[in-house]
């Protein structure tokens, strides 16, 4: 095995073990059914194989938002039945349709939706406009393309909101955290995937790798 890859795997396993013991086992993997969190689950199983953490001790928590691909849901069920027993499925209280009808529609990306929503709510401050027009290099991901400038025209009648992620994903996990006295959680994310995750991971790297929020661990990047 490549020495660099082996070192990354070892470091990732150490971070998983460290979080497990620092939280007294009150932690989980945020499992999306995608390749990144599946890699983390494989690393958790590797820790179990060498007996550094108990078997099936870290729940892999999947949030069924109702808008995942059928193939993703099928894979999560397969994992639970065939590969890792401790998979828990949680669900949001509201549906995607309810969000569209009551909060607004997500467009382009979470960051763009956030600033477009602020603009539509009357926040026409200089900073908001600079972000949408790409003049603020710190949040360049908020820039809307020239072909989308009609979205800031007064006649644009589609209500935009970034509430989708908050209601469908963040709130269900917050509820799970509270109900289970969770002290920390693990995610798999790559800086290269861009958007809000890139900004979050980059900030963490700039802070010297210190974990942010509630003992959140991104065990590899």
Regions found by a protein language model. Name each.
Residues 1-220:
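ATP-dependent adenylation/nucleotidyltransferase module used to activate substrates
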